[in-house]
Amino acid sequence: MVSPLCDSQLLYHRPSISPTASQFVIADGIILRQNRLLSSSSFWGTKFGNTVKLGVSGCSSCSRKRSTSVNASLGGLLSGIFKGSDNGESTRQQYASIVASVNRLETEISALSDSELRERTDALKQRAQKGESMDSLLPEAFAVVREASKRVLGLRPFDVQLIGGMVLHKGEIAEMRTGEGKTLVAILPAYLNALSGKGVHVVTVNDYLARRDCEWVGQVPRFLGLKVGLIQQNMTPEQRKENYLCDITYVTNSELGFDYLRDNLATSVEELVLRDFNYCVIDEVDSILIDEARTPLIISGPAEKPSDQYYKAAKIASAFERDIHYTVDEKQKTVLLTEQGYEDAEEILDVKDLYDPREQWASYVLNAIKAKELFLRDVNYIIRAKEVLIVDEFTGRVMQGRRWSDGLHQAVEAKEGLPIQNESITLASISYQNFFLQFPKLCGMTGTASTESAEFESIYKLKVTIVPTNKPMIRKDESDVVFKAVNGKWRAVVVEISRMHKTGRAVLVGTTSVEQSDELSQLLREAGITHEVLNAKPENVEREAEIVAQSGRLGAVTIATNMAGRGTDIILGGNAEFMARLKLREILMPRVVKPTDGVFVSVKKAPPKRTWKVNEKLFPCKLSNEKAKLAEEAVQSAVEAWGQKSLTELEAEERLSYSCEKGPVQDEVIGKLRTAFLAIAKEYKGYTDEERKKVVEAGGLHVVGTERHESRRIDNQLRGRSGRQGDPGSSRFFLSLEDNIFRIFGGDRIQGMMRAFRVEDLPIESKMLTKALDEAQRKVENYFFDIRKQLFEFDEVLNSQRDRVYTERRRALVSDSLEPLIIEYAELTMDDILEANIGPDTPKESWDFEKLIAKVQQYCYLLNDLTPDLLKSEGSSYEGLQDYLRARGRDAYLQKREIVEKQSPGLMKDAERFLILSNIDRLWKEHLQALKFVQQAVGLRGYAQRDPLIEYKLEGYNLFLEMMAQIRRNVIYSIYQFQPVRVKKDEEKKSQNGKPSKQVDNASEKPKQVGVTDEPSSIASA
């Protein structure tokens, strides 16, 4: 990182460059040198007039002909591309007639009383149950929701928001700009589709947004008589089940996915929490279906204890040198040992072969090198309380509870000298792609989807529709500024921030990592620029909402890692209502929340003391005595009514939310809090409105990007924070040829340019450079799209198997009688034994009945009456013998069932269910491990001109058939061998009770699983 500039440099000069310095400029491959006096306005104005753009022979007329492409150079191609020709007008025309139908109903609906409005919900439900299509109900349903929103929230959805709702109802992706009210749009189709009674899931990216949306816009469907549920991380299964049964349920993508996997690991019907899927609305759909698509959802169980090998490997990795002992491929995120690396590692470890399967040193050493080179602290992860926490590269948030697999997380822990946690083994997994494709009707909304429309259509069959904005978007996206080295880039970023800050404009600076945001923060501190930092560090995460709420204030400077899913709009002048809520929250929460409540769950240490204190600088003014007294009285009445420190944080937040919204209030305490909130908000608004005028006059919010992301879409998300709802604004990206994206994916062209330029801190402008940078970003997009597509194709193989296994498991879990399933297992197992020991093509005279009988009786001792003569008489043909053995297998099961039921009525049913579920879970877990190894192995077969995917399908299918057969065999064998044992309670318990103990069946809790570990190794006799 470069040294910061002194104040005079910031004010008067380009970073470290004299106004008369020579420039080296590249134009279409030609390096030019020019000496010309530069004015600071031309450098930092709307275009860099000093750089040279050449046409043919420098002809001005030729240059004008090419000006469209050349003027967009400096990498500023983004703004040209993404303003796009489609501004949503075609969508407006497409839905104009339906919007008109909704508007015609407005007068009629607005004349209804509250109770009459609720009755419309019942009438619409009845029409839906009679089979009337949702499309025919849409105009009235949307009109009802619009009116309810006016009454409850004080917000009337615009026509463009109705269009957004119609797009979502149609099962498409609605691209809506930031600030256009996506949260409100979601309740329109959610209400309509909930009328069927089958449930609707509204999916958001984090718990905070799910709770906010449920508490805020969820009031509208609640007002109309629908039940609205919310799923949060720490809820019990009972709470989850209750909330999933609501008409509309707000939930995060990870909670929903993990609940699905947990349901498929449940051992009783009571543990199931989900209902059948019906309709799903995904907020920030690109974040969930594209950014998160590379990371499958995994539920894992503990494996063996961690090994000391991790620490030894970490020491070796730290001693080894790059390009001497190992090479790194940053694009593929892989490392390889060189010949010297192999030899030195084997010598240090005193082993003959690094790849000896008994020691597996190679995987430990390679993971340690990956941890050293590719997984960087404050970029890929942070450390909190001696734990390595992964940072989401797309949102900048900590991914609580997530761990890297295959020993990589342990390698990072060893690198940092932290305690190594247990390794894990996969119990259940699914990709977001295949999970959400289970919904019969799926839709989503985001501010940036059109650039990924091909992926949405090819994988999810979802069309992207651009919804028009309510007011024209007037944000100005400036051309990018490109430097050779990062030093020049960071100097220019500081100058840009300083210049904008002095005009009073609000500035939002986007960085790609925690490390970058901290380094830039240090530069700004040394330059004397007051600012806020929003990244994954815990001290910043806790203040996220308040930081974003003040990001639009006069002269505010905010540094933030990726802004996707932040959920709080940046309002110019500051968000008065949000500030008022924070002030009321600051007073209320410490007095009503239980001191032990919180999300911290640890047996090692007590939870940290919770505080709701807000930095006083956040508020636009000190609260007047009158308003402070009003707030104190309202809080005191709440304490008296609810009790001193008697609520959970979630309950208190919910009541505070009701107090700060515009819906009807019956509760006296909520009414007092509402009055206090409105009074505080009004006082703050007087100041924020004045600030807003000044910020707008100065030019609005200015967004500074410091690096291109792996997708143009994420760049657009950052730009989209400015210019909301017709506000003025601007954006500009500052790039360096040393940025990761260009260094890793740029190829020879960009490397050549880096060698050609000798000045680090002059901006470069060239059509060729722009093309090269844009091509590098396109390469990244295509590369990661290919990864997601490959993951999807491979997971589809697993998905069909997963569906079959989970269907079989659910059948065993919910069936009242498992007899038909067990009979099916018995018959198929007899078929397997017969085929393995005789076979349909074996001549009759070669049939070995002794061998067959031995194997049958090994499985079922109840068939000890079988003799070769009996089989000869019963089975004159292979088919006849098959039918006879099937019948005997079936009869043996029924006989065993009768024996057990006589001993303990109802026990057999519990035993059967337990045996089926435990065998499915155990063998499915082993199957997942086997498929993982197969997937790794087939990758190398491409060198032999064999398609890895086809190889994976074939091998995976064979493994799956064998697993399903093994489940059947294990279950029926265990049932045939099952012997209930009556056991006594502990003598200690007897002495405590002072009474003799009763005899109880060992299966009153879980039946003993006899034979699962000692079943015959095969169905064929030796």
UniProtKB/Swiss-Prot annotation:
Keyword Magnesium belongs to the record: no
Isomerase in keyword set: no
Phenotype upon gene inactivation: Seedling lethal. Albino seedlings with yellow and translucent (glassy) lateral organs when grown heterotrophically.
Reported induction: Up-regulated when light-grown seedlings are shifted to the dark.
Biased composition (Polar residues): 993-1002
Expression sites by tissue: Expressed in green tissues, including cotyledons, rosette and cauline leaves, and sepals. Also detected at the base and the tip of the trichome.
Pfam families: P-loop_SecA, SecA_DEAD, SecA_PP_bind, SecA_SW
Transit peptide limits: 1-72
Other noteworthy facts: Cannot substitute for SECA2.
Similarity-based family: Belongs to the SecA family.
Protein name as it appears in the record: Protein translocase subunit SECA1, chloroplastic
Organism: Arabidopsis thaliana
